[in-house]
Amino acid sequence: MGRGPSIEGRKNASDAKRGKMFTKIIREISVAARAGGGDPSNNPRLRTAMDKGLSANMSKDVIERAIKKSTGELEGVEYEEVRYEGYAPGGVAVIVDCLTDNRVRTVADVRHAFSKCGGNMGTEGSVAFMFKRLGVLSFAAGIDEDTLTDAAIDAGADDVVVYPEDGAIDVLTAPDAFAQVRDALAAAGLEPAHAEIAFRADNDIVVDGDTAVQVRKLLDMLEDLDDVQDVYSNVDQAALGA
């Protein structure tokens, strides 16, 4: 009987995944600080990125260095934001948000992923109209639904979505109300497990069989690219076994 992966092998894989996640967060911190300054109290995007880093057990020293490199206190790489749109197999719409120091490399990598998995890149705006940009504050099961709903609506949230399959709750806001709602909920002792401004599809597409396999392959391949920060699609995640 063959042996499974060694403990060392699993650890190396875990370390690599953690390192890639840290790289993405550091880039987000860098771009946020460069765009809005290094003070998180006056820069909601930076605060969100810093919170993401701290939640991932990133040290404060690493976060501070990333901020200083972005504000010019230390030498660092300058990243720019680029967005690509396209279609996966089955007509699934895909948005790919990137932070890069080399657009030529990034677009080549993204185009290769689409092509390899049977999809195709589109022009700007070709699929974005199928999504809305929202603030999303996600709470794990166990939090009191009525308390959270009342606090969220009072704080200016647009909607509260409860997922009966696992009891999780999402509070949805307009992007410009995201920081206000997050701060109000935190002041009420309601801290989300995850908070971000993201794209949400207006309607999901169900795929199955080989199409589902190819869609999953494309999304995974895109997410594994170093320059890619976020990947959004309108596929029904249940159809992918997610």
Swiss-Prot record:
Subcellular location: Cytoplasm
GO cellular component, one term: cytosol
Molecular-function annotations in GO: DNA binding
One GO process term, biological-process aspect: regulation of DNA-templated transcription
Annotated InterPro entries: Integrase-like_N, TACO1_YebC-like_2nd/3rd_dom, TACO1_YebC_N, Transcrip_reg_TACO1-like, Transcrip_reg_TACO1-like_dom3, YebC-like
The entry's keywords: Cytoplasm, DNA-binding, Transcription, Transcription regulation
Domain of life: Bacteria
Major subcellular location class: cytoplasm
Pfam families given in the database record: TACO1_YebC_N (PF20772), Transcrip_reg (PF01709)
NCBIfam families from the UniProt entry: PRK00110.1, PRK12378.1, YebC/PmpR family DNA-binding transcriptional regulator
Family indicated by similarity: Belongs to the TACO1 family.
Protein name: Probable transcriptional regulatory protein PXO_01555
Source taxonomy: Bacteria, Pseudomonadati, Pseudomonadota, Gammaproteobacteria, Lysobacterales
